[in-house]
Amino acid sequence: MRAVVVHGPGDVRVDLLPDPVPGDGEVVIAMEWGGICGSDVSYWRHGGSGTAVLKHPLVLGHEVAGRVASVGRGVTGVEVGQPVTVHPAELVSPEALPERLAGRTNLHPRVRYFGSAALHPHTDGGFSEFRAVRADQLRPLPDGVSTRRGALAEPLAVALHAVNRAGALAGRTVLVNGAGPIGALVVAAAKHRGAGTVIAADLAGPALRIAERLGADEVRNLAIGDSLPADVELVFEASGAPGALGPVLHATARGGTLVQVGNLPGEPAPAALGDLVTREITWIGSYRFVDEITDALGDLAAGLDVDPLITHTFDLDDAAAALAVAADRKSNSGKVLLRLGGEVNE
């Protein structure tokens, strides 16, 4: 089978690998679509993502969907041809979490994640024609949800987890700072979950136009002099830019809540945080998701429209070009998809 493999900084190849065979409790998926995430771009450009550094070649990709190709022994309730997506996290240790983390499996210290070099050996992702997965990682696609849209269930789950961390949204005014793919999906998720007015802010006009199509009631283009709104009760920071923290905290109302969903850099960086104290702002981190991928599929089936986010599609063999477009701010890309194989559908 063909697979998109990163070998080091700037070195991504379409390699030929053995076709997988399902083991006990496993299913092989014939992949159809994959969405490129910022971590995929980082592995390609820098040979790592965050603290995870490549030590050997890695198949990229954790935003994927396809159809069941074969079923291993002991697997029930799964049919060949069934359209599915994948929960990309797999616990690899029986270590119990402390009580304060009950149910928060996204915070378990021993998790294998599709397309991640965090553990050794690394965990290959799903940018390949076939991938064997544990049956309990499958999430069947509801009727009416194509595999193309199903590939966006994982990033939508990240957005939904952030929304869940914020509490009830009904009728609230919400600011989303950073309208890249995750920020845009936070806009869509917040609006779908009943937020009143949703304001999106970014430095890029094309990203803001996508955010409008996903439900933003107002947009602020910071590159042309627009300012952030004042005294917003609930703010999502999705840019991950340390320089944005001061202005975003200042835009948060006294006693308000700031949900940090954009990954911040691991190295020290200057940031103006005084308002965090003087305004008694509740600053909440949001990391990946628990099982909001199931909720994401339900929302997609209920009409949450993610299509405006998809701006580019490439064939698997053109993965290097796809990564370059996803990495290039001048490309005005939203979500870049790879056609991985099968009878792909729009």
Where are these regions (language model features)?
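C-terminal hydrophobic helical "lid"/dimerization subdomain
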Residues: 1-3, 246, 290-346
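Short N-terminal strand-loop motif that marks the start
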Residues: 1-63, 129, 341-346
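Glycine-rich beta-strand-centered segment in the early N-terminal region that forms part
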Residues: 20-34, 48-101, 142-144
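Mid-domain Rossmann-like dinucleotide-binding core that forms the NAD(H)/NADP(H) cofactor-binding site
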Residues: 81, 136, 142-224
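NAD(P)H dinucleotide-binding glycine-rich loop of Rossmann-like/cofactor-binding domains
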Residues: 91-177
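Glycine-rich cofactor phosphate-binding loops and adjacent beta1-alpha1 units
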Residues: 166, 209-282, 345-346
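Rossmann-fold dehydrogenase core element
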Residues: 257, 270-309
